[in-house]
Every structure is written in structure tokens, then in C-alpha cells.
């Protein structure tokens, strides 16, 4: 059994794997580069750093550890499925982007999820405030640096998974939520499922993620590459502030800071408690 055990530095793929990967390269439409063009639309700025340090002193986020992917999309990694490599390169978008001119922005590449920022009459409405306090705080600082400082008037949790609410304490003070200066909006059942899903299934979900995404492997063509919907989950200070307003009906309309939003409850889709938001 000598040399049959796992080598943390990786090893070259077998001829069978290479044959399979080459088959996908010839079958799928990799010549279509539109997604790469669209992924860079509206780019405003990237921060001067690639790491975000957690309050505990560990590295909460390290975008630089994935730069092996930027050798160029035409680089062939026989150890990575071609579709995963393509998606991993697309997920290297890092910084502040304009989505709807002078109205809607996104910070991408700071966590597994993106933070979406809506410009109200006087302040910011934040959608999905990332996994941890440190990455969310850094994202908001980037927004205020390039778009002008505004206070946060509302936060919207789209659903009950931690990468969409765990960074809330990095962008708002709980005292301002309690005194009514900041609203937090979430779908009905949010608190129940945000807590219960982690209590009942959290250990199993984390264990699954280690196998599913290779989270404990070195970041390399032979190890951890991407999580497909994003690079990874930030490893910082996760928190939760209870919503002040629940969307309980199938369809509800709400105007905050001059911005009209139409909410549609969609429970049991990607999460047990979830909703869509439409801007008329």
C-alpha cells in the first residue's frame, strides 16, 4: 500500500480522469465567453487587500489564496472538472459593482454570498449581509468609501441560511434596531428555521460541506477550488439580530426610505424560510 495514501500536496490525475475531462472540454460550449463579460459589468473598484482578519486574529477571508485560478481560463487543470474551473474563475469577481445605475450595487467576492446595496432617499438598504461581522463591515466600508457615506436604514434577510444574515452586527448597531432607526425584514418563520436548522442539522451540514467542497484541503488545483455559488464561507464572528418586520402574506408591499419593494414568500425552496424581492 506504499504511496497509495492521500498526499496533501496533491498528485496528477489518472489517465481515466484526463480522458473524462477532455471529453467535457470538447462537449460543452466553452467558446462562449459572455458570462465573463457580464460578470465584470458595472465594476467600480476593488479593495487594496485580499485578506480580511477576524477579531479573534485568524484570517476570516483570503481571496488571494485562489489566485492560482487566474493563470487564464485557457489554462488546463486536468485535476479540476472544466465546468467547475470555469465557475471558479467567474467567482473571482472581487469588489464593488453597479447593478442598476445610481440605485442598486453589489459587493462581490467578500464571502460565499454577495451583499446587495439599495440606495434610498437618505440611506442604504442592505440585502443579505454575509456570514460574519468582519466581511460585512469591510463590504460596507468599501461602499461608503466609493459611493459616499450613508447610514444603514434597513437590512433584509432573504432566507434563513447563515451566509445571508450572519454578518449583520458588522453593518448595524443592535441599539439602533431596538430604537427603530434600523428595520430588519425577513420572511415568516425566519427565526424558527435560522435556529432550528442549525441545531438539528448543523453538525451534519458542516460535515457534508467538508466532503462536498474539500474545505480542509489546501487551495490548489489538487485541493479546494470553489463552492460553485461562491468561493467559500468566511471564518469570522457570526451573529444574529431578530427581525423587526416579518413578511407573512404570500405577497406584501413595503416602502422604506422612498424605495418600494414587493415581497413574495417562497418557503421550502432553497431554504425553509425564504422570499423574493421585486423593485417595481
Regions found by a protein language model. Give the residues of each.
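Short acidic, Pro/Gly- and aromatic-enriched capping/linker segments at domain boundaries
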Residues: 81-99, 237, 249
Amino acid at each position: 500500500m506504499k504511496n497509495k495514501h492521500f498526499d496533501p500536496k496533491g498528485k496528477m490525475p489518472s489517465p481515466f480522469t484526463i480522458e473524462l475531462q477532455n471529453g467535457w472540454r470538447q462537449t460543452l460550449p466553452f467558446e462562449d465567453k459572455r458570462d465573463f463579460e457580464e460578470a465584470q459589468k458595472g465594476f467600480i473598484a476593488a479593495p487594496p487587500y485580499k485578506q480580511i482578519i477576524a477579531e479573534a486574529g485568524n484570517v476570516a477571508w483570503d481571496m488571494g489564496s485562489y489566485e492560482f485560478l487566474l493563470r487564464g481560463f485557457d489554462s488546463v487543470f486536468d485535476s479540476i472538472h472544466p465546468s467547475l474551473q470555469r465557475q471558479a474563475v467567474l467567482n473571482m469577481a472581487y469588489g464593488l459593482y453597479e447593478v442598476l445605475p445610481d440605485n442598486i450595487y453589489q459587493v462581490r467576492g467578500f464571502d460565499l454570498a454577495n451583499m446587495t446595496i439599495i440606495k434610498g432617499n437618505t440611506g442604504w438598504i442592505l440585502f443579505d449581509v454575509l456570514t460574519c461581522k468582519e466581511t460585512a463591515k469591510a463590504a460596507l466600508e468599501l461602499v461608503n468609501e466609493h459611493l459616499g457615506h450613508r447610514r444603514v436604514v434597513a437590512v433584509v434577510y432573504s432566507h434563513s441560511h447563515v451566509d445571508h444574515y450572519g454578518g449583520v452586527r458588522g453593518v448595524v448597531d443592535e441599539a439602533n434596531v431596538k430604537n427603530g432607526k434600523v428595520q430588519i425584514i425577513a420572511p415568516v418563520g425566519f427565526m424558527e428555521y435560522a435556529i432550528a436548522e442549525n441545531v438539528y442539522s448543523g453538525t451534519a451540514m458542516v460535515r457534508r460541506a467538508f466532503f462536498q467542497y474539500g474545505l480542509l484541503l489546501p487551495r490548489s488545483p489538487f485541493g479546494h477550488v470553489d463552492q460553485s455559488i461562491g468561493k467559500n464561507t468566511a471564518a469570522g464572528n457570526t451573529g444574529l439580530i431578530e427581525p423587526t418586520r416579518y413578511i407573512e402574506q404570500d405577497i406584501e408591499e413595503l416602502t422604506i426610505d422612498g424605495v418600494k419593494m414587493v415581497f413574495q414568500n417562497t418557503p421550502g425552496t432553497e431554504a425553509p424560510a425564504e422570499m423574493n424581492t421585486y423593485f417595481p
